[in-house]
Amino acid sequence: MSTTLPKPRGRHFFANPGPTNIPDSVLRAMDRPSIDFNDPEFVEVYNTAVTGVKHVLQTKQHLFFYNASGHGAWEASLTNLLSPGDRILVLESGYFSDEWANMARGHGLDVHLIEADWRRGVDVAALRAALTADRAHDVKAVCAVHNETATGMMLPIDEIRAAIDATGHPALFLVDTISSLGSLDFRMDEWKIDCVVGGGQKGLMLPTGMSFTGVSEKGLAAHNTAKLKRFYFDWSLMMQRPHKSFIGTLPTSMFYGLQESVRLIQEEGLSNVIDRHTRLAEATRR
């Protein structure tokens, strides 16, 4: 019996919400020999890629990168910002919001789910009421998935931010942008997001395996008192490294790909990229 794999018949097109199809130029950018991650050539690639991701996030805050899927960035956000027994609110929007909540429970956090119909999305008034009732400020963080891959539900992050502000509550605001970044308008600094969870395999057009968190100054201050156990994802350790984003070996080929993907976004124009996704999404719905 032959063990030879059959040759693909034409170009493989992946009709899936993610991972997504990877542009040829991104694949070609990654097709190169390995390089020392301290080599000046790679440091320039790294810096260009990070600056490009900040542009897409619309932020000036610090980014931490991981050799991990989005689940790794989820875990990094929780363990670097919170302590055992901390109470958090998770806004239900579908499978992945529930999985993030389950991960938080696994780390010993007190998770309160703001329940919602997966077809209609969160009731912002319910969040406002929950925070208003929390006079002791026991809630340490609010977690939301910007775009729920499983249901296609998009949450109004700006409205959620306004609801938190209206109550004067000091809770951190954590947002998962894994399936929205580079496809939907997202403004980390303007919307005062304390921790953004992102991944490369969707709007950033990379293979799976790279994720990251963007962290505000308020988030970094909370990190200094967070007591959940961590090591590989520890931001304090990362900040001591030359590239200030990794523990262990950097995935150099992925950064070459990321440099090309953010170049493609800048070439088309971020607003044009978002408008294109908006048109295609509406065409799909109709």
What are these regions (language model features)?
Residues 189-201:
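Conserved active-site segment immediately N-terminal to the catalytic lysine
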Residues 11-67, 71:
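A glycine-/small-polar-enriched, mobile loop at the entrance of the PLP active site in fold-type I
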Residues 122-182:
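Active-site phosphate-binding strand-loop segment of PLP-dependent enzymes
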Residues 1-10:
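Basic/polar N-terminal segments that are highly enriched at the extreme N-terminus
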Residues 21-22, 201-285:
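Active-site C-terminal subdomain of aminotransferase-like
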Residues 90-134, 145-154:
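Gly/Ser-rich phosphate-binding catalytic loop and adjacent alpha/beta segment
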Residues 60-89, 93, 97-102:
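Conserved beta-loop-alpha segment that forms the PLP phosphate-binding cup at the N-terminus of a helix
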